[in-house]
Amino acid sequence: MLAAVCAVLFFVNGVLQLLLALGLPLGRFVLGGAYTVSPLLLRPVNLALFLAWFGCALAYLRYGSLLRRPLRERTARSIVYVSTLWLFIASVFNLFITTSDFERYVTGTLSTVACVLSMCLIWRRDRFQLCPCRISPHR
């Protein structure tokens, strides 16, 4: 369930990036609200971010055992760990540094919710692997 919600949040963020790449006036939600419409030079970046967020969503689905392919388990776990760190950094910037109210309250809330859910997912799924001092009973 947590993996599915995290994947949906990444899909939503990916759709936002796709709409920005297509030229819709949604720029208030990203980059501190500097642009209403994404400039032509940034649109390939928006498209790349769409693909990246789509890939992250697939990794969450794989990590949560909701998909069997296209990623290996180890790859999905690595992507989820890196994505969680990225969400934490993005949440700090979105909530405390940005000057855009849209980014602070909409995008910041989404990234914070996704970060907390992602941390809960990692804790629930890998809690025994997070403690490096744990001794295996098969010693």
Identify what each model region corresponds to.
Residues G14-L24, W53-Y60, N94-I97:
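C-terminal TM-helix exit segments that contain a strictly Trp-centered aromatic cap at the helix terminus
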Residues A3, A21-A48, L66:
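Interfacial loop at the N-terminal end of multi-pass membrane proteins
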Residues S65-Y81:
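Loop-to-transmembrane helix junctions at the membrane interface
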Residues L2-L18, T107, S111-L117:
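Alpha-helical transmembrane segments of integral membrane proteins, especially early/N-terminal helices
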Residues N46-A57, L87-F88, S111:
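Core segments of transmembrane alpha-helices
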Residues R77-F93:
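Hydrophobic alpha-helical membrane segments
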Residues V113-L130:
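Membrane-water interface at the C-terminal end of transmembrane alpha helices
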Residues S91-V106:
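Membrane-helix boundary connector in multi-pass membrane proteins
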